[in-house]
Structure formats: structure tokens, C-alpha cells
Amino acid sequence: MGIAVSGVIFDPPKDFDVSILNRAFALSLEKIEGKVYLLTNPKFDPRNKGDFIVHRGDRHICIMNSGVADDLLFTNDLTSYHVLSREFPAVDRMIFFCLYDSGGSYGYSAFADGELIRSKLYAVHEGHVESGIPLPAEGKWQPAILTAQEIIDEDFEDGDERRFFRHVTTGRLAPDTLVNSCIVDELLRAEYGWSPFDDDHPSKNEYYRAAEAERLPVSSEPAKTLGRQPEASSIRSFLRRWFR
């Protein structure tokens, strides 16, 4: 079973309430209680721009919704960041991310103190697109030379041009098409103690759906970035905030 979600995660502000999302994104979200979200019609899916999952943790708030994250990641539209920064002025760090197994797109954009410090995205048709100074989590994955046994295990054939990365601590292998997924997972765990890959805390999920007139169909999980990536800040001092 794969994963298909995008969103934004940040330090938990005081008095967070869904009414803030309604105001920020001009919506009328209604809470879906308990497991009833599994029975909704149409099916609940955070790739729908009207379906939101909010995960609350001791160290984070994560808002999962394609309308919040995808435009920023795929079309360089920073509206969501500016809107959330206005609503949460005390929050100085945010990470927007996407983990789309079905569309083959993985990546993130990290902000600190009002600046985009790093953007890293892999999309099927565009390949790797990145800007800014790599975060320490990326340095844990280095280009790998496969052993003879690994070549067999990965079913390499003549002319195979796949590239692999190896985790410097665990030795885990990841193809270049999936390494961003691994980096997002590690980055969020290190910074916020949680990742969307976790499924052992469903009770911390809250499910919301917009009024019918505000819903849009499931996003197509954009497979191609459009335009130029936004310029990342070159101020290295911002990076000291990550993995202190």
C-alpha cells in the first residue's frame, strides 16, 4: 500500500483551531467525526482540495491537503506560505512536502525566518529540480556503487541507467527516483518527531471537509514542475536552525 499525500508541517502555535484555516483559505470546513470519514461520499481524499487532514503532535501541526501544498511545490506559487505566515506570525519554520507514490513525485520546500532556504523536488517528467543549500538530512544519502549481489537483487539488466543512493549510517539503498521520499521522512522525524509514513497514531488525525460548493476533484498529482524554482536564500545562518 503506497502513500499519496502532500501538506505543510510547522511548530505548534498556541490556540490552533480549524477556524484559522477557514479564514486563511476562505473555506467552510466541517469536522468529520471518528472513522466516519471512511464512509464519506465522495470518498475522503486529501488530494481533493476540499478535504483536509490535521495531525496534532507535541512538536508539530501538520495540515495535509493538496490545495495547501501542491501549487507551492509544483508551480512555485508561494501564496500558501504567505497566508499561513500571516495567520501564525510566531511560527518561524515550515516545511511543505509531497509524497505521491502513484504520481512518482516526492520533495519538499523548507522555510525559516521568512526565507525559502531549500527546495528539492523529483517529478517523473522533470527529474530532479532543486535550489538552495542542501540540508544535513540530504548529506546522509550518498551516491552508491552497488555490490555484485545488490546488482542481482535490484534486477539490473544491460543498459540499465538507474542510479542509487546509500544511507551512510544504515546502509539502506534507495533509487534516485525515491531518495527524496526517504529524505522527507527523515527530515520530518528529526525536526518534528513524526512523519506521514507513521500509521500508529490515527487518533491524532482530525478530518475536515469543505462545503460542497468549495470542493474540487482529486488532484492529478502534478508530474511536471512549471516555470523556474524560486530563488532560495543563501544566508547560511538560517541552516543552523535545522538539526541543531
Predicted segments, located by residue:
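Weak global preference for isoleucine
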Residues: 3, 9, 20, 32, ...
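Long, compositionally biased intrinsically disordered terminal regions
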Residues: 98, 113, 118-244
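Exposed alpha-helical structural elements
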Residues: 20, 79-83, 234, 238
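Alpha-helix capping and helix-coil boundary motifs
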Residues: 12-18, 71-73, 160
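Short, intrinsically disordered low-complexity segments
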Residues: 27-121
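Short, extreme N-terminal segment that most often corresponds to the first beta-strand
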Residues: 1-31, 242-244
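Extended aliphatic helical segments
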Residues: 5-8, 18, 36, 54, ...
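Broad hydrophobic/π-residue packing in well-ordered secondary structure
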Residues: 4, 60, 107, 240-243
